[in-house]
Structures are given as C-alpha cells and as structure tokens.
Amino acid sequence: MDAGPGAWLFDCRGLGAQPQWNALRGVRGEVARVHAPGVSLLRPTRLVHPRYPLYIAPKPGGLFVTAATEIESDDLSPASVRSTLELLSAAYTVHPGFGEARIVELGVQLRPTLADNLPALRLTAPRRMAINGLYRHGFMIAPALLDAALELVDQDHSPLAEQLGLALIR
C-alpha cells in the first residue's frame, strides 16, 4: 500500500497485524449490555473485583455496559457463564435495579496486547509506523499515543513516549 510521496502510513489493525508483529497476543474480554430504565448512574463506575477491575458505563436510553473481564485466551467463543454471572452480579451490587434489567447483548472480543501490557510504536519501514498493543487502555491512552507518534514523525524521537514508558521499536 502506498499513500503517496511524503506521506506516512500508520498500521493500527490490532490483532490483524499479528502475522507481522508476532509479539501480539489476544486477551479475551467479555461485555454485558443491559437495559435498566430504573437505574440512574451519571458516570462510569469502576468496581474492584477479585479477578479483574470491572466497570459499568451508562449509555443513553437506560442502557448500561458492564465490562472489562480479562482472560488470557484468544478464544472467541460465546461469553462464559462464569464471566456473565460476575458482570451481572457486579452490576446488581451497585444498584438493585439491575436485578430487573433486560440483557440486550453478551459480547466477546480480543484485545491486542504485548508482553508488558503496554502499547508500542514500531517503525516497520521508511515512513511506516505500527501502533499496537493498547490492551484495556485503548480509548484512554489513544490521544497520548497519537501525540507520541506525531512527535516521532516530526522529530525522529518522542520524549512523550519515553515519559510514558512506551516501547519504541526501530
């Protein structure tokens, strides 16, 4: 793929890049989306759980997302009973109104992850950069990762990547 003279190509395919980036692995995450019109949460709520930190995020129309399981597996089969019970029980402990919620969706996906669970920037060819391994932190760390990538493009180094402890692979 050629983006034209002077252009950069950024590869942000997640696990789709695994054939070119062998260190990537998938970490299974499961999510429960429920409709609970009797529950009123205004902000995402993080929960401490024995196996992994969970969260409940309110969405418009009385919908809530309970998620953030992390299972060391690249299995994309349907959600397990154990994880589903953990997600729904966590919601119920936050508000008893979740006991009458309707399950809208149970989903499973894999998070692209590197050995240290931190994202990395990788120069794969002249003017080509792979950005990957965002693990559980995708939407939270993506703006800083973009800033680090742009520093690398503009200055050929990234003080921000160093400050954040991000790997820069040349």
Question: Locations of the language-model features?
Answer:
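Short hydrophobic core segments
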Residues: P5-L15, L146
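C-terminal catalytic lobe of FAD-dependent flavoproteins
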Residues: A101-R170
